[in-house]
Curated annotation (Swiss-Prot):
InterPro entries: AGPR_AS, AGPR_type-1, NAD(P)-bd_dom_sf, NAGSA_dehydrogenase, Semialdehyde_DH_NAD-bd. Pathway: Amino-acid biosynthesis; L-arginine biosynthesis; N(2)-acetyl-L-ornithine from L-glutamate: step 3/4. Belongs to the NAGSA dehydrogenase family. Type 1 subfamily. HAMAP family: ArgC_type1 (MF_00150). This is N-acetyl-gamma-glutamyl-phosphate reductase. It holds the Pfam family Semialdhyde_dh. GO terms for molecular function: N-acetyl-gamma-glutamyl-phosphate reductase activity; NAD binding; NADP+ binding. PANTHER family: N-ACETYL-GAMMA-GLUTAMYL-PHOSPHATE REDUCTASE, CHLOROPLASTIC-RELATED (PTHR32338:SF10), N-ACETYL-GAMMA-GLUTAMYL-PHOSPHATE REDUCTASE, CHLOROPLASTIC-RELATED-RELATED (PTHR32338). It comes from Pseudomonas savastanoi pv. phaseolicola (strain 1448A / Race 6).
Length: 344
């Protein structure tokens, strides 16, 4: 049984980790921390978890207690894992970080986008980017895993087959992405209030979003060189979900795009390439650790459209984190993640 600790258990990704791990056959949450809620039983804050964590309460983060775990998940704002990850790694504990702290390999670039110096640049050489569909072998031997963001997960999985095959014009990629309001986190903000977000639909961060350098970093690796990406995120009035509509120019019209995508993801348990002509819906992946993809070539032209949907809290965060844990500890990759999407 893998002994699990969670730092930051009161946000959406924290409670989603608890929900998924409650049904995991080979993992047990033994520590969960929150400075603001220390002493409160988990089941009191989250009644949906009654009967699963009745003996577990939030505690103040303590390196000694966390260091006794096999793995510690950080479901925290950026900067927190910088301060604690090194001590946990020194104690022999594996670290899986859901924040952005170790996603970017360039600490200067990280500081530019997050507005503060990188707090642990010496650990970047140990950090493995936790996109299993790309880095599965590296994940198996990792000490520190950086779980990809939600937009980067949906966008990279949609573009990868085209870039790896070398058939797209890498200089003019477009990612037109929509997210539900849970992507903004559980903290109070005016933009995510019901009266502000409901019955409205808006773009934001067009000048530059923090996920842009992460997406670009991954796509460069796939393409084997520089890429040009325009990334425009939008907020839509739903709770969960990412819908990425991706555009790339593929001049060679003889390429069987459906076959290309099906072959690339044939052995991936959590990527579903839909039949030709399909339009995946976010509700089909709600609560599931699945990226559902469809590829189109409208009017037979040279512009290819890829539709990619995920649940931002599952495959875009906590589910992918558990998937990484399963790989890291040699477990069945599907363990605890077999939930079908919730419909309606």
């Amino acid at each position: 049984m893998v002994k699990v600790g969670i730092v930051g258990g009161t946000g959406y990704t924290g409670v989603e980790l608890l929900r998924l791990l409650a049904q995991h056959p080979q993992a047990e949450v033994v520590v969960i921390t929150s400075r603001s809620e220390a002493g409160m039983p988990v089941a009191e804050m989250y009644p949906n978890l009654r009967g699963h964590y009745d003996g577990l309460a939030f505690s103040v983060p303590d390196v000694k207690t966390l260091g006794a775990c096999d793995v510690v998940f950080f479901a925290t704002p950026h900067g927190v894992a910088h301060a604690l990850a090194g001590e946990l790694l020194a104690a022999g504990t594996k670290v899986i970080d859901l924040s952005a702290d170790f996603r970017l390999q360039d600490p200067v670039e990280w500081a530019k986008w997050y507005g503060q110096p990188h707090g642990a640049p010496q650990l970047l050489q140990d950090a493995v980017y936790g996109l299993p569909e790309v880095n599965r072998e590296q994940i198996k031997n990792a000490r520190l895993i950086a779980v990809p963001g939600c937009y980067p997960t949906a966008t990279q999985l949609g573009f990868l087959p085209l870039l790896e095959a070398g058939i797209a014009d890498n200089t003019r990629l477009i990612a037109d992405c929509k997210s539900g309001v849970s992507g903004a986190g559980r903290g109070l903000s005016i933009g995510s209030l019901y009266s502000e977000a409901n019955e409205s639909f808006k773009a934001y961060a067009v000048k530059g979003h923090r996920h842009l350098p992460e997406i670009t970093q991954g796509l460069r690796r796939a393409a084997g060189g520089d890429i040009g990406l325009t990334f425009v995120p939008h907020l839509v009035p739903m709770i969960r979900g990412i819908h990425s509509t991706l555009y790339a120019t593929v001049a060679d019209r003889s390429v069987d795009l459906q076959a290309l995508f099906e072959k690339r993801y044939a052995d991936e348990p959590f990527v579903d390439v839909m039949p030709a002509g399909s339009h995946p819906e976010t509700r089909s992946v709600r609560g599931a650790n699945v990226c559902r993809i469809a590829v189109h070539r409208p009017q037979g032209g040279d512009l290819v459209v890829v539709l990619s949907v995920i649940d931002n809290l599952v495959k875009g965060a906590s589910g992918q984190a558990v998937q990484n844990m399963n790989i890291l500890f040699g477990l069945d990759e599907r363990a605890g993640l077999s939930h079908a999407g919730m419909m309606p």
